[in-house]
């Protein structure tokens, strides 16, 4: 196997690795975005319109208590997801760089 064939094989492997890293990054980004969307939804409650004002206030207080608990849980998930997303982003960037360098080397040999 000559140098051209070796670089060709190496670029194929590098491309597969890049594709895998990009899929992992996409999955992490979608999970993180879902948590961000859930947080945004918690900030937009739809107030009941046909209730007595005292009952509506009680409903609002209970909703806020529940929403605060959900925010706490979502924020824990979001912190983990953000760390995973940052790691996946770094890994994808490295794979992209390696693939680009191998492509340039292959171009010089051809």
Language-model segments: what does each one mean?
Residues 1-110:
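Charge-rich amphipathic alpha-helical interaction elements
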